[in-house]
C-alpha cells in the first residue's frame, strides 16, 4: 500500500495469542476455536499486537508491540464446554487470534485483563499507534472538535 500511495500514512496491525510459549493464531474453523478456548480455560494468555506506521515520502517506518495479559475464566466460573459452545454459536470469532472478541460477547469468558495499552486486545494498540503517528509528524489532534 505504501508503495502505491507514497503520500499516505499507512498503518498495519496484527495479533497473535501466546499460551505458555505456544502461538495461537486465528482458528478459522469452529472445531479449532473450541480447542483453543478449552486450552485457554483457567489460563493466562499473552496477546501480542504489533502496529507498524509507514510514511514513504518522509522515509518514516516504525513498529511497536503491545502485550495484553488475559486470564480466562475456568469451567466453574463461566467457561464450561456449554459456555464455549454458546459463545461460538453467537459470535463466530473464527478470524480472531485466541477465538474471542473482548469488545463483544467474548468479554464474558475473561476474568482479568492487564496491559499498558488495553485497546491492543481488539487488534490495534491505539496508545502505541498515536505515539508512532506523532513520531511520524502526524498532527493527531489537528482539526479535533468537541
Language-model features: where?
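Anionic-ligand binding patches
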Residues: 1-146
